[in-house]
Amino acid sequence: MAYWLCITNEDNWRVIKEKNIWGVPERHKNTIAKVKKGDKLLIYIKQENVNGEVKPSRIVAVYETASEVYRDSSRIFKSPKGMGNETFPLRIKLKPVKIFDRPIEFKPLIPKLKFITNKRKWSGHLMGKAMREIPEEDYRLILEYAT
């Protein structure tokens, strides 16, 4: 089993929660191809301005993958600014494990997370990625903050 941090925004988090589907752009096909049924996915919402309020980067849920990767270009996800008509066609069906009552703010976790080796420029570990594998130790640490 592998553990993944899946990077999204507020709009597409609503889609994930409603439809139990994770999707990535074609350019991330090599990454999503490594995901197997039964893997655990943490949903990370990047910092953004929502209705004039700056919401910090946070982890909102954990899911288990319930399918292999499949292709579907139907428009269910919202294309973020600068991504044109992106449909996130490489998808995986999900099964919710836990949707956190209170999101876990990400910045306080940074000093403790093993996968973030550059603590000062930590966003570089996530920038330009749709998802990234994380060590089981980091996954367990994040879950501790959810309780």
From Swiss-Prot:
Q: Which family does it belong to?
A: Belongs to the UPF0310 family.
Q: InterPro entries attached here?
A: EVE_domain, PUA-like_sf, UPF0310
Q: What is this protein called?
A: UPF0310 protein AF_2356
- Offer one Pfam family short name for this entry: EVE
